[in-house]
């Protein structure tokens, strides 16, 4: 049995920032971070190097120290308009205070900290005139490469300041045998042991949804299901969205579709980026990245178009629904993401290798040519097609025949357990980050870590 003052389960953005702030407040506190993935410097993904996904037991993209954000495009939203509901929990002033603290901490660990991209009124007007809503937010874009270096500096600082980080350590159970402490059952390299902790911070991210559900069952914590987002990753020539990316870097646009009046969103824009694959609990889904290094830029841009689904009673398995849609894409794609030309989709035919080889937009991901209409439900597919045509009005060329759609891209949001104002679900047990059902991005996950550290 090992003993610690504070155990942090999950070494992603929320967990690392909680540890950083705890150390600044309590120089002598014993703190342990465990993560089921590898240390950042040891996280290697064949798919990220242009090879096929080999279905690693623990995905190096979505799991490991520094979290799934380590290999993201690393866009830090300096605001509360999207990326989570932290302002609803804390009030906008308090939430912004912690988000600004995150920005300052990142600057301290970053080399050549990037400029802030600010909102643009002309682009907002252009979207409004075409029945679209451009979300207003300042953005700090580190890029996948610069973010990895920044996170490694933060990790090194924590280790140098006597915070123990244990990788390849999976928490398989959490209990509270007495009121004074918790006991975590941990498996590390097939060796099982227990850690006793006065306080526990659960920061397992979206990939830890099953663990959060297990905790709710163990401690009889009430929770509510969140929405899920299902859609595609879209790739086209970078010049089509250059007006937007030059002025605000990342356009986040909401669309109300005509047929069903559903809300879709365009987000996770990557200028000069690449489309990537990631393994979410054995399901291969699409994502996107871009780099700060100009030598790594491509002639393409990519972004997600997702349709939000809010289920009502009696259905209470939104995550399982989204996973099954993505699993169907893998079945058709022979274990891989599928890609289709927009022109082929509109004409009701699958994309084959010949048509893909003649395409003017060269795919940046080695995906299987196929037919997305065989995967996505009619309502979601209709929403996506209508959104592409709507976006074409503000960025002509978006609806070109050669635009590529990769399927599927899905965002699963964890259960939202009932908690107090300190994000405490029972005394001494805190849930933060995307695994809490509150944050949906890097900035708010990190801000939650800082906030909870102030409550301990």
Task: Identify the residue ranges that each predicted region occupies.
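Residues forming the flavin
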Residues: 2-83, 117-456
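Dinucleotide-binding Rossmann-like beta1-alpha1 core, especially the glycine-rich loop
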Residues: 64-115
């Amino acid at each position: 049995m090992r003993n610690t003052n504070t155990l942090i389960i999950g070494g992603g953005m929320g967990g690392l920032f909680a540890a950083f702030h705890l150390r600044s407040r309590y120089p002598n506190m014993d703190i342990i971070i465990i993560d089921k993935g590898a240390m950042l410097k040891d996280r290697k993904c064949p798919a990220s190097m242009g090879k096929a996904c080999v279905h690693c037991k623990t995905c190096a993209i979505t799991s490991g120290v520094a979290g799934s954000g380590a290999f993201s495009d690393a866009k830090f939203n300096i605001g509360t308009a999207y990326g989570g509901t932290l302002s609803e929990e804390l009030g906008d002033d308090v939430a912004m205070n912690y988000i600004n603290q995150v920005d300052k901490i990142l600057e301290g660990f970053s080399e050549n900290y990037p400029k802030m991209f600010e909102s643009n009124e002309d682009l907002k007007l252009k979207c409004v005139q075409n029945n679209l809503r451009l979300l207003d937010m300042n953005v700090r874009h580190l890029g996948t490469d610069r973010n990895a270096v920044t996170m490694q500096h933060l990790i090194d600082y924590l280790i140098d300041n006597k915070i123990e980080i244990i990788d390849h350590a999976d928490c398989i159970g959490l209990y509270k045998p007495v009121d004074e402490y918790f006991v975590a059952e941990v498996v590390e390299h097939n060796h099982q042991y227990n850690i006793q902790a006065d306080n526990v911070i659960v920061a397992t991210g979206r990939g830890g949804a099953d663990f959060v559900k297990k905790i709710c069952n163990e401690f009889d914590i009430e929770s509510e299901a969140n929405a899920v987002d299902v859609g595609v990753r879209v790739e086209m020539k970078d010049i089509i969205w250059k007006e937007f990316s030059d002025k605000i870097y990342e356009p986040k646009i909401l669309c109300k579709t005509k047929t069903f009046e559903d809300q879709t969103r365009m987000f996770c824009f990557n200028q000069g980026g690449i489309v990537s694959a990631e393994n979410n609990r054995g399901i291969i889904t699409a994502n996107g990245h871009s780099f700060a290094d100009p030598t790594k830029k491509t002639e393409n841009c990519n972004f997600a178009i997702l349709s939000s689904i809010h289920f009502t009673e009696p259905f209470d398995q939104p995550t399982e629904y989204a996973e099954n849609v993505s699993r169907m894409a893998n079945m058709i794609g022979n274990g891989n993401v599928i890609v289709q030309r927009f022109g082929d989709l509109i004409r009701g035919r699958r994309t084959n290798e010949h048509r893909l080889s003649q395409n003017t937009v060269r795919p940046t991901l080695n995906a299987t040519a196929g037919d997305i209409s065989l995967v996505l439900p009619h309502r979601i597919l209709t929403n996506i097609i209508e959104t592409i045509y709507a976006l074409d009005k503000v960025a002509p060329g978006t609806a070109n025949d050669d635009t590529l759609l990769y399927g599927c891209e899905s965002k699963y949001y964890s259960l939202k357990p009932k908690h107090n104002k300190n994000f405490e679900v029972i005394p001494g047990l805190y849930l933060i980050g995307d695994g809490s059902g509150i944050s949906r991005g890097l900035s708010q996950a990190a801000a939650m870590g800082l906030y909870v550290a102030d409550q301990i």
